[in-house]
């Protein structure tokens, strides 16, 4: 299987860096959004090859309608520089614009040469790319709620290499990963995409796929933008580090992908396959509901469970990667093994723990069995997501005629003895900061809203104590302790 042509703009433009840096000082500047920043990184390092810039209108329309660039190459997701009208008004074809790193708003990471600007039909984009014009889809919500109304197309030149400061040892570019595979004679590599922690089922699935195809495993998780509510990438990477030790020595490698996901189901799966081909993989695992965003506004799945497999198989030979389709893995307790559900005989006893149930067990501190996940993985998840009784909380006490109520709550909680409690006597910007830091550290905090700074709002995640006009201090205190106990904080 031939290697995909890699457009590594970082390598191409390295000799021009000093000249481009000097030019950028006099150019108009745009601070990228988080998603644009992820897109630029993968354009510059070749992860989005054959792209070498943001799509012009011709490419955009062809991708939306036909899953191809205007030159014919398969590419299923529009990669566009969306701007608001005030940003785009002054731009015209031929202009040069410096694109800035959003983390500091100063570092020039690329220069864009404007080719065109155009107003997209967002409703059509939503229907064609994401399958529905439904704000319950996170990418559709982004499209209408956050993305600018003008798209600017044009080619990029790399200026300052993008630096990351976490898990640097796993941040390989496509060229670096290809070189590593070649150096270690990894001629067959099966890539595994994930935005979630990995458990035993994922390990069994990837090992099985590698054995079937005589390949090594590339664990290639997304650490850019994922689905809102996903577990943070810091926790996930620690999990991947731990589970990597459970693979046969020399059979698996971890590399992080700075991708901004769109959760576009079948189209996204095809996009992921192209990206993995660019990173040097020969095979790509596509499982059940690949890159699905969950339920639509009618409570139904946006995509069928295996739609992604069907679509990618149609293009696999053309893009040059072998698809490894897998159904969900399930545990057979009587045999102590995992099998794909389609390989399980009718009537066989099986066990599984859903993501919802896992989150519940973490929340209440319930047992997570070893058949489901490795102890070291569970320990990492519990550290990042402790049960309610180990989490901090903040009680905001409204002004009342009895100014002793905040002190009474502190005394009652301290008497209970299960939590460390701090009283902050006034709401202002400084006390909000202290309360949030104490909460993060697992402490209980009581904040009096008497004499509150009117310019400071009570954070939404705080619990405001409900006080009825005739309630006594003891009645309020009892009600608060009962509520905290019912919610699992005590």
Swiss-Prot record:
Its main location: cytoplasm. Belongs to the sulfate adenylyltransferase family. One of its GO terms (biological process) is hydrogen sulfide biosynthetic process. The record marks 326 as: Induces change in substrate recognition on ATP binding. InterPro entries: ATP-Sase_PUA-like_dom, P-loop_NTPase, PUA-like_sf, Rossmann-like_a/b/a_fold, Sulf_adenylyltr_euk, Sulf_AdTrans/APS_kinase, Sulfurylase_cat_dom, Sulphate_adenylyltransferase. The oligomerization domain is distantly related to APS kinases, but it is not functional and does not bind APS. It is required for oligomerization of the enzyme, although the oligomerization state has no effect on the catalytic activity of the enzyme. GO terms for molecular function: ATP binding; sulfate adenylyltransferase (ATP) activity. Residues 391-490 are annotated as: Required for oligomerization. Catalyzes the first intracellular reaction of sulfate assimilation, forming adenosine-5'-phosphosulfate (APS) from inorganic sulfate and ATP. Plays an important role in sulfate activation as a component of the biosynthesis pathway of sulfur-containing amino acids. ATP binds at residues 193-196, 287-290, 329. This is Sulfate adenylyltransferase. It holds the Pfam family PUA_2. It comes from Schizosaccharomyces pombe (strain 972 / ATCC 24843) (Fission yeast). The keyword Amino-acid biosynthesis applies. The modification Phosphothreonine is found at residue 356. It is found in: Cytoplasm. Its EC number is 2.7.7.4. Keywords: Amino-acid biosynthesis, ATP-binding, Cysteine biosynthesis, Cytoplasm, Methionine biosynthesis, Nucleotide-binding, Nucleotidyltransferase, Phosphoprotein, Transferase. PANTHER family: SULFATE ADENYLYLTRANSFERASE. Pathway: Sulfur metabolism; hydrogen sulfide biosynthesis; sulfite from sulfate: step 1/3. Homohexamer. Dimer of trimers. Sulfate binds at residues 193, 195, 291. The record marks 199, 202 as: Transition state stabilizer. Residues 1-165 are annotated as: N-terminal. It catalyses: sulfate + ATP + H(+) = adenosine 5'-phosphosulfate + diphosphate. The keyword Amino-acid biosynthesis applies. The active site is at 194, 195, 196.
